[in-house]
């Protein structure tokens, strides 16, 4: 959850969607008791205890609230969650070897909470799980005979939570679940597949991605199962929204606040970013990247095109973290061209806002993109996105009006989009018109909340 811990877009979504849904229902969030969360929550009240079973240790469930009063349950088990690094791996980026235990313990407790067995004062009408880390929740409900409806949202099908066959015993799952119509996936246990099989309904974070994952190209080996769920009208795409407090007219983190048409204010932010990153004074376009630095995001395509972008008069600024090899490649590129490439490894909220505000274009050459948030924030700040025509990028970028789309995740196709951006930059009237159109777009969470609320009511029959 973005209030306490952020890993990719999932943290932002799990913070924003519950708040948007508060007018419709009694929404409560459950999180593992990660170190960062425990340090920031105060007045945690123990409401229930989970005994050990299989290889899952005993734990306690605490209840607290966010600063704005949103109820939060936290699973307290220091041996599983009180660790350095990120929620999924150690400080060197390696996955924790007991991630099957860590997330099975969480999912089992979430199922117990939903069934009314942990907090005596509350039970759920419906439970909404997200990604492989919570995908066992619908499975545990089914194995315990609960009739509670459940939703699984797939934020990225490529992350499946795969573990050795012995994990089945370790997490207390029935042996009968290890088959092609259960958790088995090429002789491994797939946590994600558990949710795909047992959840009452599946959602993804854009309609385009919902269609894409039923194909072999994007289905990651699960397209057959997903086609069955889609054909049964049990797979829905609901586009994510963004935090609308990210507004260039009011962001205190900017060098100068600005609105549509105030290009002097936008230039002031560009000058600030250039100075911050040690880039040369330039009248050329600045290309920003705010992303996880992983293969999926097409960072290698940016690296392969960097010299051509710079030789044409452009500059590149990057912030994000991810695969060590890509991080190092970006650092090396900066060292070769320190006047034209700026790199900040790690995610910083203020830094991201400043890059969106200062850049003329935002590069998003993702090989696939279930939804994507950066292209929506970029438009809000007048930074026109250049994106591969896939997933949420295809739904949120209007080609030639609020940004640029290219057809294939290849060097030449990507450069084609970049060249169109250069042409627009040289045509001031076109650039101004596109910026105004982009900054006028609305990506409110209220639209997503309406869709989820309707789905909740349908499944819970309330």
UniProtKB/Swiss-Prot annotation:
Binding site for ADP-alpha-D-glucose: 6
Entry's Gene Ontology molecular function annotations: alpha-1,4-glucan glucosyltransferase (ADP-glucose donor) activity; alpha-1,4-glucan glucosyltransferase (UDP-glucose donor) activity
Reaction equations catalysed: [(1->4)-alpha-D-glucosyl](n) + ADP-alpha-D-glucose = [(1->4)-alpha-D-glucosyl](n+1) + ADP + H(+)
Enzyme Commission number: 2.4.1.21
Pfam families in the cross-refs: Glyco_transf_5 (PF08323), Glycos_transf_1 (PF00534)
Membership in a protein family: Belongs to the glycosyltransferase 1 family. Bacterial/plant glycogen synthase subfamily.
Protein name: Glycogen synthase 1
Encoding gene, per UniProt annotation: glgA1
């Amino acid at each position: 959850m973005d209030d306490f811990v952020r890993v990719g877009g999932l943290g932002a979504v799990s913070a924003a969607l519950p708040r948007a849904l508060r007018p419709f229902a009694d929404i409560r969030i459950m999180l593992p008791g990660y170190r960062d969360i425990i340090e920031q929550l105060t007045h945690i009240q123990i409401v229930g205890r989970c005994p050990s079973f299989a290889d899952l240790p005993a734990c306690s469930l605490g209840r607290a609230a966010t600063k704005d009063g949103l109820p939060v349950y936290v699973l307290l088990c220091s041996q599983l969650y009180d660790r350095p690094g990120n929620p999924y791996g150690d400080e060197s980026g390696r996955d924790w070897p007991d991630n099957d235990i860590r997330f099975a313990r969480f999912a089992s407790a979430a199922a117990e909470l939903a069934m009314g067995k942990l907090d005596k004062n509350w039970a759920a009408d419906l439970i909404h799980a997200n990604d492989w880390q919570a995908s066992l929740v619908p499975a545990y409900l089914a194995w315990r005979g609960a009739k509670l409806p459940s939703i699984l949202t797939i934020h990225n099908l490529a992350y499946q939570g795969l573990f050795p066959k012995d994990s089945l015993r370790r997490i207390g799952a029935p042996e009968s679940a290890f088959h092609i119509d259960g958790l088995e996936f090429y002789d491994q246990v797939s946590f994600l597949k558990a949710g795909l099989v047992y959840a009452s309904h599946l959602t993804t974070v854009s309609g385009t991605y919902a269609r894409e994952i039923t194909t072999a190209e994007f289905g990651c080996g699960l397209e057959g199962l997903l086609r069955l769920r889609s054909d049964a009208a049990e797979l829905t795409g609901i586009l994510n929204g963004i935090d609308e407090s990210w507004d260039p007219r009011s962001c205190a983190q900017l060098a100068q606040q600005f609105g549509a048409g105030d290009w002097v204010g936008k230039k002031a932010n560009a000058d600030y970013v250039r100075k911050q990153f040690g880039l040369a004074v330039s009248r050329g376009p600045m290309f920003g990247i705010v992303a996880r630095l992983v293969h999926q995001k097409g960072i290698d395509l940016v690296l392969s095109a960097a010299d051509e972008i710079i030789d044409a008069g452009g500059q590149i600024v990057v912030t994000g973290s991810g695969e060590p090899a890509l991080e190092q490649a970006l650092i090396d590129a900066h060292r070769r061209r320190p006047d034209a490439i700026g790199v900040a490894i790690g995610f910083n909220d203020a830094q991201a806002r400043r890059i969106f505000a200062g850049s003329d274009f935002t590069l998003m050459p993702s090989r696939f993109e279930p939804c994507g948030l950066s292209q929506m924030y970029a438009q809000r700040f007048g930074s026109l996105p250049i994106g591969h025509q896939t997933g949420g990028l295809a739904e949120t970028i209007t080609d030639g009006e609020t940004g640029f789309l290219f057809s294939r995740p290849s060097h030449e196709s990507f450069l084609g989009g970049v060249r169109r951006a250069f042409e627009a930059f040289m045509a001031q009237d076109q650039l101004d018109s596109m910026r105004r159109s982009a900054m006028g777009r609305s990506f409110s969470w209220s639209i997503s909340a309406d869709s989820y609320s309707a789905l909740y009511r349908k499944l819970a029959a309330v």
